[in-house]
Regions:
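Glycine-rich ThDP/TPP pyrophosphate-binding loop and its adjacent helix/strand module
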Residues: 351, 365-371, 380-396, 401-527
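Short conserved micro-motifs at the rims of enzyme active sites and ligand-binding pockets
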Residues: 158, 257-258, 488-490, 556-558
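Residues within alpha-helical segments
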Residues: 3-6, 10, 442, 465, ...
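Short acidic DE-rich linear segments
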Residues: 582-583
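Alpha-helix capping and helix-loop boundary segments enriched in small/acidic/polar residues
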Residues: 96-99, 135, 146-153, 207, ...
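Conserved active-site loop/cleft motifs that coordinate metal ions or position small ligands
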Residues: 476-478, 545-547, 556-557
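Ferredoxin-type iron-sulfur electron-transfer modules and their immediate structural context
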Residues: 2-152, 159-244, 248-369, 421, ...
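Glycine/tryptophan-enriched, flexible segments
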Residues: 533, 549, 553-559, 565
């Protein structure tokens, strides 16, 4: 078929008549759209740099254009101005079939589909043609699903997971050209205020509730159907307003900040993830350094707050604010509110110490320190640093997007690659089993460890992430992430389905090890259906290609792969017994 396609390219040439007048046409240049709406820093960056670079005219920029960015930083949220319009088909919402589950938003790799909760007044001001429903569980509110067609990549993950009603989905895929005029509906949705009572009703750390929080990772350049970005996006919805991210070089750094476009953004208060990238293998140490720097600054501020609280000149209001901040010093969930109260109480006071505290208010609240990277970094070239950070005992979170291969560099084998998988440096199928990074981390006894696979268990994913962040020590999350390098025969629109199959067949296991919990180890996966194991392997080109090239070797390695999966699950069930019998 491939040869026939090549031959058709030569024999199927069609002559296109070009008008004679084109010979004398003048070059009118590109039609640049001048951006005016948004934060001044990002608007200036988009107009002066991003637009030119995206048009491949970056070489024409003078050095003076970069004077505001000499420290290497760039404004958050510039990806929202690209509006690439690259999808062939985009999701269309049929409100009659919607059960308001928010699954579509939860799995969207690019944050282009979002639920909106509107008051009656907001709904009355909605653009013409905006469909909406009475909101379930929230009388007086209207509910809508909004879609940014111009930012969509057309992967279809949302439509794939949509449960719909009576076999009829609420989301179907249709031609982009027929829905480009609906962009104002999405744009309106971004102006609607975030409803604290709605988030409180459905809870921010649940599948449904989390999606009423603005994603602070939006419109990245990740592949259509990417398995990594849904995890990162969810983390920003849970903790993005107080996040620091150290990002290892790899896919997550490329979709995380491909110059000049920055998909990490801010909320209505101007708060969002502070992101940086370490070029080499020292990302864990890099993130650890961020944490130590924060701790040093906050410890100094803590001493000054204690001095203010102990002062005889301090009012009762000031003392109460200081006490609340000190009491919540180590709680990320509570310290932010206490910080706002402290700053409000100290502002305007003519006191050098108070002025110093207010001047450094950005450092007062406890931050959520994350270290992002892929398996090539965490299992291989950066493993020493990962181990060092986990051993430190410090309150820090490591998120590993586990694609079981070096994704960004083209699919090289890593220590996460499983037996029989074909990858660069393992063209004949990898002969050795996957490194058990989770067990290595659990051996410390004081590290929170979780394995998650979003498509297999939406609730377990958000629960594990919330538990890891709340745990007052090091945490490690290994997230199964389907990748284009896997060659999923069903296509990347079925990435969430593949995550589900991986767990159902025992290829991947979901579990949580929480040293702070009474029940330390929880195996969240049911007993696998091993009958479908070989079909799962053959459903991905990384395995199926070996079966085509060398069936005998494939049969041997695939059998070994399956045996290792059985052994792995049996080991996990023993951990359930071991920790379940603790006094």
């Amino acid at each position: 078929k491939n040869w026939a396609a090549i031959d058709a390219g030569a024999t199927g040439v069609v002559k296109v008549e070009v008008p004679e007048s084109w010979k004398n046409c003048e070059d009118e240049g590109l039609d640049y759209k001048v951006v005016t709406d948004g934060r001044k820093d990002v608007v200036d960056f988009v107009n002066n740099i991003q637009t030119k670079v995206s048009a491949q005219e970056g070489n024409s920029l003078p050095v003076s254009a970069f004077k505001d960015y000499v420290d290497g930083s760039t404004p958050s949220g510039s990806a929202a101005y690209e509006k690439r319009g690259i999808a062939v088909n985009v999701p269309v919402w049929n409100s009659d079939n919607c059960i308001q589950c928010n699954f579509c938003s939860y799995v969207c790799p690019h944050a282009v589909i979002r639920p909106v909760a509107m008051t009656a007044e907001e709904a009355a001001n909605a653009p013409a043609g905006m469909k909406m429903l009475d909101m379930t569980g929230m009388p007086g509110y209207k509910f809508a699903i909004t879609i940014s067609a111009l930012d969509c990549t057309g992967c279809g993950s949302c439509a794939n997971v949509c449960p719909g009603k009576k076999g009829e989905k609420a989301l179907t895929m249709d031609k982009l050209a027929d829905h480009m005029d609906e962009q104002p509906i999405f744009d309106f949705g971004t102006t609607v205020s975030e409803k604290e009572d709605v988030v409180a009703k459905f809870k921010a750390n649940t599948v449904k509730g989390s999606q009423f929080k603005k994603p602070l990772l939006e419109f990245s350049g990740a592949c259509a159907g990417c398995g990594e970005t849904p995890y990162a996006k969810l983390i920003t919805q849970l903790f993005g307003d107080r996040m620091y991210i150290a990002n290892a070089t790899g896919c997550s750094s490329i979709w995380g900040n491909s110059s000049p476009s920055t998909p990490y953004t801010v909320n209505a208060k101007g708060q969002g993830p502070a992101w940086d990238n370490s070029l080499f293998e020292d990302n864990a140490e890099f993130g650890y350094g961020m944490l130590l720097a924060q701790n040093a600054i906050r410890d100094e501020l803590k001493e000054k707050v204690e001095n203010v609280a102990a002062s005889e000149e301090a009012s009762e209001e000031v003392k109460a604010a200081c006490a609340e901040w000190l009491d919540t010093f180590g709680s990320g969930a509570l310290n932010g509110v206490a910080t706002d109260k402290l700053v409000a109480a100290l502002e305007g006071i003519d006191c050098p110490t108070c002025k110093y505290i207010v001047a450094n208010k950005a450092f007062l609240a406890k931050k959520s320190q994350w270290i992002f990277g892929g398996d090539g970094w965490a299992y291989d070239i950066g493993f020493g640093g990962v181990d060092h950070v986990l051993a430190s005992g410090k309150d820090i979170n490591i998120m590993v997007f586990d694609t079981e291969v070096y994704s960004n560099t083209g699919g090289q084998s890593s220590k996460s690659t499983k037996t029989g998988a074909v990858a660069q440096f393992a063209a004949g199928g990898k002969e050795t089993k996957k490194k058990d990074l989770a067990s290595i981390a659990m051996s410390y006894g004081y590290v929170y460890v979780a394995q998650i696979s979003m498509g297999a268990d939406y609730a377990q994913t958000v629960k594990a992430i919330a538990e890891a962040e709340a745990y007052p020590g090091p945490s490690l999350i290994l997230a199964y992430a389907p990748c284009i390098n896997h060659g999923i025969k069903k296509g990347m629109s079925k990435a969430q389905t593949e995550e589900k199959l991986a767990v159902e067949t025992g290829y991947w296991n979901n579990f949580r090890f929480n040293p702070a919990a009474e029940k330390k180890f929880t195996l969240d996966s049911k007993a696998p259906n091993m009958e479908g194991y070989q079909d799962f392997l053959k459903g991905e080109v990384r395995y199926a290609s070996l079966a085509m090239k060398n069936p005998e070797r494939a049969a041997k390695l695939f059998a070994k792969n399956e045996a290792e999966a059985k052994e792995r699950y049996e080991y996990l069930t023993k951990l359930v017994t071991l920790y379940g019998n603790e006094e």
